[in-house]
Design a protein with these regions (language model features):
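Aromatic- and glycine-rich peptidoglycan recognition patches
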Residues: 67-77, 82, 95-96, 116-131, ...
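Short, structured beta-strand/loop micro-motifs enriched in basic residues and often containing a Trp
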Residues: 88-125
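N-terminal capping segments
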Residues: 1-91, 145-151, 159
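Structural motif
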Residues: 135-139
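Intrinsically disordered, low-complexity sequence elements enriched in Ser/Thr/Gly/Pro
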Residues: 13, 21-23, 99, 105, ...
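Small/flexible residues
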Residues: 27, 86, 108-109, 195-198, ...
Length: 224
């Protein structure tokens, strides 16, 4: 399995084949994977990008190349080990289980909540900053922009979280899927970008998910 950063870079290298689309159902069953209005580029958003990296699925083996969304849903999800003594669930079952509980971890807010509830959340330093805590491959979560904050609060989006990125090798930056919130082609044609974390604002939560499902600090029992 490729590491998180190594996997994330394969999408950056193929960013011109992708288009950022915030539709809430990217990489979901029944979704249209390709954007027929924009040269059939693969649709991607911030959280689907993070899930692909966590699963160690490089671009060349992803549904964007194979066209096999169902195959993606049958993949084992090792970072979600399930309760002790049970086999590792597939990513499809993980998504479905949390969606049924109203905690859709396919989205950034649901994944952030999952990280807090199951021991993956990082503790900031005494000043409340994550700057000295972050390591490459960590996840950073951000609150909705001021123009949309009221909307996120109204719909009770957990912590009003609207975006997630992956901390890059230079920990001042994150690699993330980003772009216009509207369904349109990016002017710069870069669905995957390196963004200075400080330019996005202070993360409201950071987490470290190891691909084998451990936190590195304590043994976590996860109920399925």
């Amino acid at each position: 399995m490729k590491g998180i950063i190594e996997t994330a870079k394969t999408y950056y290298d193929n960013r011109e084949s992708l288009i950022y689309t915030y539709r809430g159902r990217v990489l979901m069953r029944g979704d249209e994977l390709y954007d027929s209005e924009n040269d059939n580029r693969g649709r991607i958003d911030c959280s689907s990008y993070v899930h692909l990296a966590l699963l160690g699925v490089p671009y060349e083996e992803s549904p964007y190349v194979t066209g096999d969304v169902e195959g993606f849903f049958t993949m084992p999800c090792p970072w979600y080990p399930g309760s002790r003594g049970k086999e590792v669930l597939s990513i499809g079952k993980v998504f479905a289980a949390h969606s049924e509980r109203g905690r859709d971890i396919r989205r950034a807010s649901g994944l952030a909540r999952y990280c807090r509830e199951h021991g993956f959340e990082l503790t900031p330093d005494e000043s409340g900053s994550y700057d000295k805590v972050l390591q490459p491959g960590d996840l950073v979560f951000f609150e909705a922009a001021p123009s949309r904050l009221e909307e996120y609060i109204y719909y009770k989006i957990w912590m009003a979280i609207a975006h997630v990125g992956i901390v890059a090798e230079d920990t001042r930056y994150m690699i993330n899927a980003t772009g216009s919130s509207k369904h349109e082609l990016n002017v710069k044609n870069e669905a995957i970008r390196y963004t200075r974390i400080a330019d996005k604002g202070a993360p409201v939560l950071a987490a470290r998910i190891k691909q084998d499902g451990t936190t590195g600090s304590k043994d976590v029992l996860i109920e399925t």
